[in-house]
């Protein structure tokens, strides 16, 4: 059985397929290993659903009426929604599956799928989703700490990230070296860091991932 991280809410497996029999069989399969799931018969129905804030993955049919699985993947990517996807494909959909993998899909399985293999892939996919979610929450905490800085502290931290010394920062901002050191102490206290290297790493990580969301 899949073991969840005790510090994270129960993960969810979303199943999207316009074939209700597929949805039912996957629901039964996931229930058999006590995995929470929710099914949808269209991509639009999924997009309109108010998703809880937790780790999740998608089991997605690549061909559906209305918005296709590929189109949904593209929309999620455009919205910076980070949710690993396992595509279900029919015979002859291999070229589409290759495109899906290039766009970041976790895997694709051809119908009819082997139940145990599907479960194995879902468990691997959920492990990735949970790790991503923990990292996302950590980054959110870092962002909230950065937002607590004063305008002057923000000026100084950006100059520190650019590699300037306290002496050069003092000259650039027309303040004393001692004042810069006081601000640096306040910055370390607010961010919970012990060194300039940790501060720089936090800022660069948040800059890189600011636009990414989970659900």
Predicted regions, residues:
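Non-catalytic signal-transmission and effector/linker regions of two-component phosphorelay proteins
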Residues: 1-14, 20, 141, 207-215
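Acidic catalytic/metal-coordinating carboxylates
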Residues: 41-42, 68-71
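Active-site beta3 strand of CheY-like receiver
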Residues: 53-59
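Receiver (REC) domain active-site loop signature in two-component systems and cognate sites
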Residues: 62-64
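C-terminal output helix
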Residues: 93-95, 109, 113-122, 168, ...
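Basic, Lys/Arg-enriched C-terminal extension of HTH/homeodomain DNA-binding domains
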Residues: 188-215
């Amino acid at each position: 059985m899949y073991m969840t991280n005790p510090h994270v809410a129960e993960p969810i497996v979303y199943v999207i397929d316009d074939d209700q029999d597929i949805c039912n069989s996957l629901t039964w399969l996931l229930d058999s290993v006590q995995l929470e799931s929710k099914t949808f018969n269209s991509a639009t129905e999924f997009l309109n659903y108010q998703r809880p804030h937790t780790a999740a993955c998608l089991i997605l049919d690549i061909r559906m009426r209305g918005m296709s699985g590929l189109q949904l993947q593209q929309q999620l990517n455009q919205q910076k929604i980070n949710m690993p996807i396992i595509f279900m494909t029919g015979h002859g959909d291999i070229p589409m599956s290759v495109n899906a993998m290039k766009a970041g899909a976790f895997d694709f399985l051809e119908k009819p799928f082997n139940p145990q293999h599907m479960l194995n892939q879902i468990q691997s996919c959920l492990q990735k989703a949970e790790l991503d979610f923990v990292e996302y929450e950590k980054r959110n905490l870092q962002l909230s700490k950065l937002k607590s800085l004063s305008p002057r502290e923000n000026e100084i931290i950006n100059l520190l990230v650019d590699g300037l010394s306290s002496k050069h920062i003092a000259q650039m901002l027309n303040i004393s070296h001692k004042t810069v050191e006081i601000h640096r102490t306040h910055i370390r206290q607010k961010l919970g860091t012990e060194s300039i290297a940790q501060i720089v790493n936090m800022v660069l990580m948040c800059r890189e991932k600011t636009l990414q969301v989970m659900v």
